[in-house]
Amino acid sequence: MKISPKESWEQSLSLIAQNVSQQQYNTWFKPIVFEKYDEQTHTLLIQVPSPFVYEYLEENFLGLLSKVFHRCFSANVRLTYRVVTDKEHNLSQNI
């Protein structure tokens, strides 16, 4: 039985939590919001709260994210980010 992209996201978070400290998880991963996964292009879009979080994830956790997303989504998954800096006014920037 095939699982939904949202379920794949939940599996990803569980695997990430097993590989980082609770403080790291709460600081860097808990604020991430799953936006969508395009199965045809294998593109995963996630929302992060700031450019700093995006940069920190890329510099410090890209290997872990790649490994986990390859396992839970697709071997060809392409990670994209949307920085949502102001949810009230829906200000965002795709990275």
Which positions does each model-derived feature cover?
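Intrinsically disordered, low-complexity basic tails and flexible linkers associated
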Residues: 1-95
